[in-house]
């Protein structure tokens, strides 16, 4: 079985919240795709409830695209501690951390239920499992800790 980089990361050494560049892969025509670890909470210490994580996921899908070019996908980790962000091209962790911070500031602040895309039976595979209240509370907590552009040394972005 192929080795998966994320499973070789020593989860006891990282300091969440952070943005980590996992890898840059180049396609046959030279196109670069970058995979980021957006770790919102400390692994093996806490996990975001599914309704809150689901709502954060739906909001980040649009908010990150508004804040940076080349977003392909932002999907939650099964462990519920953060997200994979896949982008076209090469972006640095500071740029991504700033986009994430700005997105979470919107979620924690002015976001209203109407801002959450894909919350109906025809637009979501589990539309009843959302909580804007939970998403807001998690966003506030994450922001209060600061988002680092480095997983091992706290380099909190402004």
UniProtKB/Swiss-Prot annotation:
Coiled coil, from the record: none
Swiss-Prot/TrEMBL keywords: Autoinducer synthesis, Iron, Lyase, Metal-binding, Quorum sensing
Gene Ontology terms for molecular function: iron ion binding; S-ribosylhomocysteine lyase activity
Cofactor: Fe cation
One Pfam family cited in the UniProt record for this chain: LuxS
Top-rank EC class of the record's enzyme: lyase
Record: residues binding Fe cation: 54, 58, 124
Transmembrane regions: none
GO BP term, pick one: quorum sensing
Cofactor note: Binds 1 Fe cation per subunit.
Keyword Iron annotated: yes
The enzyme's E.C. designation: 4.4.1.21
Disulfide bonds: none
Reaction equations catalysed: S-(5-deoxy-D-ribos-5-yl)-L-homocysteine = (S)-4,5-dihydroxypentane-2,3-dione + L-homocysteine
Domain of life: Bacteria
Primary role: Involved in the synthesis of autoinducer 2 (AI-2) which is secreted by bacteria and is used to communicate both the cell density and the metabolic potential of the environment. The regulation of gene expression in response to changes in cell density is called quorum sensing. Catalyzes the transformation of S-ribosylhomocysteine (RHC) to homocysteine (HC) and 4,5-dihydroxy-2,3-pentadione (DPD).
SUBUNIT field: Homodimer.
Family: Belongs to the LuxS family.
Name of this chain's protein: S-ribosylhomocysteine lyase
UniProt organism field: Lactiplantibacillus plantarum (strain ATCC BAA-793 / NCIMB 8826 / WCFS1)
């Amino acid at each position: 079985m192929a080795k998966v980089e994320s499973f070789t990361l020593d989860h006891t050494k990282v300091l969440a919240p952070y943005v980590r560049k996992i890898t840059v892969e180049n396609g046959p025509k030279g196109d670069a795709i970058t995979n980021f670890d957006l770790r919102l909470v400390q692994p093996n210490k806490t996990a975001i409830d599914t309704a809150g994580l689901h709502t954060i996921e739906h909001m980040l899908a649009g908010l990150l695209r508004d804040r940076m070019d080349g977003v392909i996908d932002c999907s939650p980790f099964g462990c519920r501690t953060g997200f994979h962000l896949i982008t076209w091209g090469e972006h640095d962790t500071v740029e991504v951390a700033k986009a994430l911070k700005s997105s979470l500031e919107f979620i924690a602040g002015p976001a209203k239920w109407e801002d959450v895309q894909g919350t109906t039976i025809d637009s979501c595979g589990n539309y009843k499992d959302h909580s804007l209240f939970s998403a807001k509370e998690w966003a506030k907590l994450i922001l209060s800790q600061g988002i680092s552009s480095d997983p091992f040394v706290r380099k909190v972005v402004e």
